[in-house]
């Protein structure tokens, strides 16, 4: 019999929110009787934007902005129907992107 697995990837700009969401998911899955591995921190994606401060000239004067995307991975092994129902009813913050693969 093959093991079933639910893989959950979380993405957010704020690392505190993503850690809280991951803890909620892990706690809910463990309470419903499933095995959980994670949250596993994945590499943080950093995007840097460089713009010229002045309107017309002064190309040497620039400003840089960065955007960091934090990612976490959670694997739920042998989920029960109770686990799936509990995860569907979970309330998570709006700043967290959730990607679920069965």
Curated annotation (Swiss-Prot):
GO cellular component: ribonucleoprotein complex; ribosome
Molecular-function GO terms, alphabetical: structural constituent of ribosome; tRNA binding
SUPFAM superfamilies named among the record's database cross-references: Ribosomal protein S10 (SSF54999)
Gene Ontology BP terms: translation
Annotated function: Involved in the binding of tRNA to the ribosomes.
Annotated organism of origin: Macrococcus caseolyticus (strain JCSC5402) (Macrococcoides caseolyticum)
Protein keywords: Ribonucleoprotein, Ribosomal protein
Subunit structure: Part of the 30S ribosomal subunit.
Matches recorded under InterPro entries: Ribosomal_uS10, Ribosomal_uS10_CS, Ribosomal_uS10_dom, Ribosomal_uS10_dom_sf
Protein name (database record): Small ribosomal subunit protein uS10
Keyword Ribonucleoprotein annotated: yes
Family that this chain belongs to: Belongs to the universal ribosomal protein uS10 family.
Pfam families named in the record: Ribosomal_S10
Gene3D superfamilies noted in UniProt: Ribosomal protein S10 domain
């Amino acid at each position: 019999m093959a093991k079933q697995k639910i893989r959950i990837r979380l993405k957010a700009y704020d690392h505190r929110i993503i850690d809280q969401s991951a803890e909620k998911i892990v706690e809910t899955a463990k309470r419903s009787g499933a095995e959980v591995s994670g949250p596993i921190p994945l590499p943080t994606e950093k995007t840097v934007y460089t713009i010229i401060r002045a309107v017309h000239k002064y190309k040497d004067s620039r400003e840089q902005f960065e955007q960091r995307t934090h990612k976490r991975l959670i694997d739920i092994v042998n989920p029960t129907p109770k686990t799936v129902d509990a995860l569907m009813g979970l309330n998570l913050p709006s700043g967290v992107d959730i990607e679920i693969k069965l």
